[in-house]
Amino acid sequence: MSPHSRRLNGVQPDEATDHISGAASASVRLVEYGGFECPVCHQAHGAVNMLRAHFGDQLRFVYRHFPLREVHPHAELAAEAAEAAGAQGRFWPMHDLLFTHGQHLKEKHLLDYAGQVGLDLARYTNEMSDHVYLQRVQEHVLGGQHLGVRSTPAFYANGVFIDVSFGLQHLHEAVDKALLQRS
C-alpha cells in the first residue's frame, strides 16, 4: 500500500525523541520528513512557518530527518549538527539557520552556525567528531522508510500523507481538512 492511500499511525509524535514545536493540545499534528540540503524542503520551511503563524496553537509541528545522501552529500552531517544543537537545547534555532543557509553545509559552515546559535563549541566539536547523533538521524530515516517515504519533503497531517508533489499549497488545504475532521 502506498503512503498516499493510507492513514499512518506510526507518525505519532514521540515526546522523547522528536523535535516538536507547538501546543500539546493542538488539533493537528504536522510531521515533516526533510533534509537541510533539499531545495524543495527550503521552500517547505517557509510554507510551514506561514502555517505555524496562521494556525497558531491549533498546529503542532514535528521535524524528522530524512537526508538523501546520494543527492545531497552534506544533508546527513547537517542533520547531525541539528541533533547536536538539540542536545544543547538549540534545535530550532539551528534548524532555521540550516534552512536559511542550505547551500553552505560543509563542516566549516556548520561549526560557524553552531557558534551563531550559542552552542558550547568544544562539546559540539567532540560530538560531531564522534558522530554521537548519527544513529538518531539514521533511525529517523528508517522510520520514514517504514512509512513509505522515498523523497523529501514528506508530510503527514494527523497521520495522513499529504501529497505536495504538485505544490506546497496542499499543506494548507490538508491542515484545514484535518481541523474540520477534528471539529
Predicted regions mapped to residue ranges:
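N-terminal targeting signals for export/organelle localization
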Residues: M1-Q12, S183
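Short, functionally important structural connectors and interaction interfaces within domains
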Residues: Q12-P13, Q58, L97, D120, ...
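Structural alpha/beta surface segment adjacent to cysteine/selenocysteine redox centers
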Residues: A26-G115, D120, T125
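C-terminal cap of thioredoxin/glutaredoxin-like
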Residues: H4, E32-G34, V40-M50, D112-S183
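A short beta-strand-turn-helix
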Residues: G10-V28
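Short clusters of hydrophobic/aromatic residues that line enzyme substrate/ligand-binding pockets
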Residues: I20-S21, L105, M128, I162
